[in-house]
Amino acid sequence: MGRFIFVSFGLLVVFLSLSGTGADCPPDWSSYEGNCYLVVKEKKTWAEAQKFCTEQRKECHLVSFHSAEEVDFVVSKTFPILSYDLVWIGLNNIWNDCMLEWSDGTKLTYKAWSGIPECIISKTSDNQWLSRACSRTQPFVCKFQA
């Protein structure tokens, strides 16, 4: 009986230490692969959303995606909270200086952007990225490295 209690206590200690791996994230944030994510339902412009994120923590920004698995994780968090599937992400063309090149390989030296800064939203239901005027309001996702 004493051995059973000792083993049970040891397993409890291991479980509690492992369950604390996401504890680096503040309350209401979700943890994935060493990053913390916050889904914000309130609609803001891209700049307001980015400002909101940086006000949470200095190193926090609108979400950036680096794998399909990360997108799937964010979708699993946004779907239950939002009534629709469009959220601001960290991509933008505010400075109109995309690193584009012509199909013949020459650099983009002449620019004729429309003058309306474009920011990127993610359609989380099918992982499409769409360009929208930065002045439109959308929900968004913040991210920082834990």
Curated annotation (Swiss-Prot):
Disulfide bonds join C25-C36, C53-C142, C119-C134. Is a potent glycoprotein Ibalpha (GP1BA) antagonist. Concentration-dependently inhibits botrocetin-, ristocetin- and low dose thrombin-induced platelet aggregation. Inhibits platelet adhesion only through inhibiting the vWF interaction with GP1BA, but has minimal effect on other platelet receptors, such as alpha-IIb/beta-3 (ITGA2B/ITGB3) or alpha-2/beta-1 (ITGA2/ITGB1). Causes an instant severe thrombocytopenia in rats and is not lethal to mice. It comes from Deinagkistrodon acutus (Hundred-pace snake). This is Snaclec agkicetin-C subunit beta. Expressed by the venom gland. SMART domains: CLECT. Its main location: secreted. Residues 1-23 form the signal peptide. Negative results: lacks hemorrhagic activity in rabbits. Has no inhibitory effect on the coagulation cascade of humans. Does not agglutinate human erythrocytes of four groups (AC, BC, OC, ABK) and rabbit erythrocytes as well, which indicates it is not really a lectin. Coiled coil: none annotated. Heterodimer of subunits alpha and beta; disulfide-linked. It comes from the Eukaryota. The keyword Transferase does not apply. The keyword Secreted applies. Belongs to the snaclec family. GO terms for cellular component: extracellular region. Keywords: Disulfide bond, Hemostasis impairing toxin, Platelet aggregation inhibiting toxin, Secreted, Signal, Toxin. The lineage of its organism: Eukaryota, Metazoa, Chordata, Craniata, Vertebrata. It is found in: Secreted.
